[in-house]
Amino acid sequence: MNAPLPMTATQGNRPTLAELEARDAFAARHIGPDTPEQQHMLKVLGYDSRAALIDAVIPEAIRRRDGMPMGEFTEPLPEEAALAKLRKLAGKNKVLKSFIGQGYYNTLTPAVVLRNIFENPAWYTAYTPYQPEISQGRLEAMLNFQQMVTDLTGLDIANASMLDEGTAAAEAMTLLQRVNKHASNTFYVADDVLPQTLEVVRTRAKPLGIEVKVGPAADAAAAHAFGVLLQYPGVNGDVTDYRAIADAVHAAGGLVVAAADLLALTLITAPGEWGADVAVGNSQRFGVPLGFGGPHAGYMAVKDAFKRSMPGRLVGVTVDAQGNKAYRLALQTREQHIRREKATSNICTAQVLLAVMASMYAVYHGPQGLKRIAQRVHRLTATLAAGLQTLGFTRTNATFFDTLTFETGFNTDAIHAAATARGINLRHAGATRIGVSLDETATRDDVVALWEIFSHGKPLPASLTFDAIEAAAEDAFPANLARTSAYLTHPVFNTHHAEHEMLRYLRMLADKDLALDRTMIPLGSCTMKLNATSEMIPVTWPEFSQIHPFAPLDQTVGYREMIDQLEAMLCAATGYAAVSLQPNAGSQGEYAGLLIIHAYHASRGESHRDICLIPSSAHGTNPASAQMAGMKVVVVACDENGNVDLEDLAKKAELHSKNLAAIMITYPSTHGVFEQGVQQICEIVHQHGGQVYVDGANMNAMVGTAAPGHFGGDVSHLNLHKTFCIPHGGGGPGVGPVAVGAHLADFLPNQDSVGYRRDDNGIGGVSAAPFGSASILPISWMYIAMMGSAGLTAATENAILTANYVAKRLSPHYPVLYTGQHGLVAHECILDLRPLQKETGISNEDVAKRLMDYGFHAPTMSFPVPGTLMIEPTESEALHELDRFIDAMIAIRKEIGRVEDGSFDRDDNPLKHAPHTAAVVTANEWTRKYTREEAAYPVASLRTQKYWPPVGRADNVYGDRNLFCSCVPMSEYAQD
């Protein structure tokens, strides 16, 4: 892999046609180091080949040597051939205009948003903004999203996105249970809630022992539930005045969640104004394509009293070291990476890229533009309703915004067939009912076409003309629900309506951030590798982006073939027997895997097995997921080398033998080494009746070289947004497939509510759509198809090679905390800065912030060990970039040395004051005990290419003590 181009005939060697075809050319572009660079790194490490290095790193007992056959995808496809093959699959899909609704709508993505966000690597290759100083652009965009949701829902505070509406509702249920001291264990769901949402809620409730009751909204108070879920508007279109119901629920000791349509909220009373305590929903119709179900940004907004119990990311406003406004992630102590099994949720990746798109849709249109879109949709719906009633059809919903449900008698199938023939999908609302949901793409012609479809081919009455019916159509939601409160009044939603202004605003935000389009992002455990352009191109093809998740099967043949092929690819890579792509984040894959284990035990009459063993080094999502799955966490100790303490494991497995459900391990370990005893771990747990969950977060170190399904794993989740090249999007989207052994295949998730049943024994839906974030699956398909088995294996080998090269070169300067056999690491390494901090006061945070002055994103801070930095360079970085990072780290170590020898003041030095903004460096007054040049240009190369952090070090304590999670008043900008 990465061989030099073949010599030409004039050079004396005539290349073969196979060499000229260069079928593996993509692998040479994906893998950063070329052959000479690889040989150089191997020489530094003392090995003569990649194979020799890998043999030294990976235990022989688990080493994979079968070449990882993948059927027709074993050999790589050139980029153009892979695109052509995928285009052929896409062509098997049928793109109809879907008026199905049920939470998903056609939408018009503004071209300026599509090109400059969705298709822009400055946005889609960024990471979650844990380092706020180099993330100010997307943090501002996320804050816009929060402001948009807060305004439209009429509540006090919103988070920065949820995975989808179904999981948002499930999270709201558990939130209300946490904050409500009501003795009840019942959660009441109105019978007009979206069916896919109800299924996800039921799935979440079952392991937690929550009883879900379903019935009319009017009966909610009588249920004496701790919480009530109301759909607003309902699935059949009704716009209900819930004021009295909310009052009655509150009087009975309950709390209220509204699942609300954001576009409808521009015209109807906000949930917070009629008594809802929490609002959830989907922002998809704000410019995000259907995508066969995702990815889309769900949302959650709550009353101020519940802000510390809210799940997911929350952007807040703080000040930097100079007292200037800055954005940051707020209240992180409630999240899984800190609170573990006590966290409010297991959410890690959410849907930031899609939330940014939705927020920019609102910025682009502004409040008046959104209202105009909503009014037009409602007017067309009212016109459609009046015409169908003229034709003799009975409408079952007295009120509506955009959705109608009509009685069709025995003509239902014929109407559906006629609609399909005209290129339109309608909602199946029962044997004798049809639902129609209009959206911003609907036209006058669509309304007339629907009249003709319902008329069974008979000519429309002469009196039934669009203009005549439209002129008489009236608003069809209760007058007392007409919205009177203002929304989106902040200048950001009222300024950027000219496209030049919008374009420059997006550019200004992007320029504030560091993403992979500027520099490597060496985040350990995060695998920030190349997201190739050819992989991204198919995502916006209409055949993938414009398909409704509940479209008829015959319209999604290409999607399902692609999904089947991708599942087979992932089975080949992992050694498992079956895969589900439904989980739309790694955390959801974990959760699904644990539910599958529970279902398996229950099928054997052992539902009492509820103990989950988790090593102390585990990622925070592991214990959080176990708690959500109804399991009790028992921590297993790790030894001084970071490995699972086999003696402690054996003791605890024996102690809990009768109730042992599973162990969750990460492999290679979160400490970045291949533990020698992994098979022994699996054997101990299996001997006591448990299942082995192998967290696939570090699968980038195993593809082609080891397989969890071969060395004892029973179930794993994968992160397609790590190992298989889906970009991180600044904090989502992600895909977290769950892969299982043959004995667990029957328990993979269904989505019965929308007709997706994989197996009668399958667990309930864990995502709202049957295939989760389906529209980004082509990214991973393209990556695997273009790499082939040998290319994927070479990628793994190079990921291990680059990590060991970085560790080797940095080890004289920083202690490498953990190594495996032969003193080597896996695909990442941990630098221990604790001794330096003890000696000099310079912390890992100081080093992380100083790296920004050198133009780098910091490695992972304090995970899995406090006071450390974890580095994962991936296979995609060329030697030049690796050396640039290494040189920066060495230069920083020399700066620390100057603190040690006293030539830098212990408190007034470039590390303690990092990062340095242009404003600070160019200020008239400079009183620091080091030079401006030392601050801004610590290495000469920065003079030709310099990134300036837009803010100084963010004050986290101030931000949490003075929590402010809405757009900053313009007066604040004027002061900056």
Curated annotation (Swiss-Prot):
GO terms under biological process: glycine decarboxylation via glycine cleavage system
Keyword line: Oxidoreductase, Pyridoxal phosphate
Essential cofactor(s): pyridoxal 5'-phosphate
Origin: domain of life: Bacteria
Oxidoreductase in keyword set: yes
Gene Ontology, cellular component aspect: cytosol; glycine cleavage complex
Keyword Transport among record annotations: no
Gene Ontology molecular function terms on file: glycine binding; glycine dehydrogenase (decarboxylating) activity; pyridoxal phosphate binding
Disulphide bond pairs: none
Residues carrying N6-(pyridoxal phosphate)lysine: 722
Listed EC numbers: 1.4.4.2
Catalytic activity: N(6)-[(R)-lipoyl]-L-lysyl-[glycine-cleavage complex H protein] + glycine + H(+) = N(6)-[(R)-S(8)-aminomethyldihydrolipoyl]-L-lysyl-[glycine-cleavage complex H protein] + CO2
Subunit and partners: The glycine cleavage system is composed of four proteins: P, T, L and H.
Physiological role: The glycine cleavage system catalyzes the degradation of glycine. The P protein binds the alpha-amino group of glycine through its pyridoxal phosphate cofactor; CO(2) is released and the remaining methylamine moiety is then transferred to the lipoamide cofactor of the H protein.
Family (UniProt): Belongs to the GcvP family.
Name the record gives this protein: Glycine dehydrogenase (decarboxylating)
